[in-house]
Design a protein with these regions (language model features):
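Thr-Gly-centered strand-to-loop micro-motif
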Residues: 35-37
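Local beta-strand/beta-hairpin segments that build beta-sheet-rich folds
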Residues: 68-69
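A conserved beta-turn-beta hairpin within the catalytic core of GNAT-like acetyltransferases
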Residues: 28-33, 77-79
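Flexible, glycine-rich phosphate/dinucleotide-binding loops
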Residues: 21, 29-30, 74, 121
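Conserved N-terminal beta-strand and adjoining loop/helix that marks the start
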Residues: 1-21, 39
Length: 153
């Protein structure tokens, strides 16, 4: 394990009419789905980062929400802590935004998608630990906040 501090990310789970909002990323020809989210900026709270990332990537404003899940990812020297918020109130119409974090990386934000439970079960969603949590709590989004554990490749 690395001595470097972990990277902390904030992301948002937004459900509407039985569908979950996801963003599609492409990296080295590999397409996969994630929740809208990203890294904290200096001086930013987790909640502020989650709201900013949702706005940047989808154009939606998150008005209210709560912490829903914490998980970790370890791969070699890389350690990421993901903080997932559940959006309870939002405004706007979704549109494909930008992901400034990928500007100088070989990863691109290529789409936004609303997935129903069946489509989500078949989707290439990352991280898989969070995907299992989302599938298990699809019908009960008011589940208490939980620590999901550590995912390693």
């Amino acid at each position: 394990m690395s001595d470097a501090a972990p990277t902390v990310r904030a992301q948002v789970a937004l459900f509407a009419d039985g569908h979950l909002l996801c963003v599609r990323h492409r990296k080295s020809g590999d397409d996969y789905l994630v929740l809208p989210g990203g890294h904290l900026e200096p001086g930013e709270t987790l909640w502020e980062a989650a709201c900013r990332e949702m706005r940047e990537e989808t154009g939606l404003e998150i008005l209210e929400g709560r912490l829903w899940a914490l998980s970790e990812f370890h791969a070699g020297a890389r350690h990421v802590v993901d903080c997932t918020f559940y959006a309870t109130s939002w405004s706007g119409r979704p549109r494909l935004g930008t992901d400034p974090e990928t500007e100088f990386q070989p990863m691109t934000l290529v789409g936004i998608e609303w997935l129903d439970r069946e489509a989500f079960a078949e989707a290439a969603f990352r991280p898989t630990l969070l995907a299992r949590w989302l599938r298990a709590h699809w019908e009960s989004p008011d589940a208490p906040a939980a620590y999901l554990g550590v995912e390693s490749p």
